[in-house]
Amino acid sequence: MDYDRRYAAVILVVLSMFLHILHSLPDGDFIIQGCPECKLKENKYFSKGGAPIYQCMGCCFSRAYPTPARSKKTMLVPKNITSEATCCVAKSFTKATVMGNARVENHTECHCSTCYYHKS
């Protein structure tokens, strides 16, 4: 009986230490390793011709929530979870001509917004 109490006490101490360490880390520390925030980054390929060309690059996050019952009824393949993804896109941009006659967008401001183009 005394052995069981010590065993339970050790488990509780280890669990509380683990929770303390996990709680003290910044939010999302394990999730976003190596993924920078959504911001402007110089495009080295298009910047060769003179003026720098900037593109929005980085990570945004998605959210998931339970699918509302009325929406589930209209789905061909009903799903319990609905997800909404956001992508790093230009909030504003200017048109620029590079490499003679190629027109590109030179991004001036970025934000996370609805994804319109998905990779297949």
Swiss-Prot record:
One protein family per Pfam: Hormone_6
Record keywords:
Disulfide bond, Glycoprotein, Hormone, Secreted, Signal
Q: List the disulfide bonds.
A: C35-C59, C38-C88, C56-C110, C60-C112, C87-C115
User: Which InterPro entries does the protein's record reference?
Assistant: Cystine-knot_cytokine (IPR029034), Glyco_hormone (IPR000476)
Show the GO MF annotations: follicle-stimulating hormone activity
Keyword Acetylation, does the record have it? no
Where is it predominantly found?
secreted
> Which subcellular locations apply to this protein?
Secreted
Glycosylated position list: N80, N106
Where does the signal peptide begin and end? 1-24
Entry similarity comment:
Belongs to the glycoprotein hormones subunit alpha family.
How is this protein organized at the quaternary level? Heterodimer. The active hormones thyrotropin, lutropin and follitropin are heterodimers composed of CGA, a common alpha chain described here and a unique beta chain which confers their biological specificity to the hormones: TSHB for thyrotropin, LHB for lutropin and FSHB for follitropin.
Show the PANTHER family listed in the entry: GLYCOPROTEIN HORMONE ALPHA CHAIN, GLYCOPROTEIN HORMONES ALPHA CHAIN
Q: What is this protein called?
A: Glycoprotein hormones alpha chain
* Organism from which the protein derives: Meriones unguiculatus (Mongolian jird)
Q: Which gene encodes it?
A: CGA
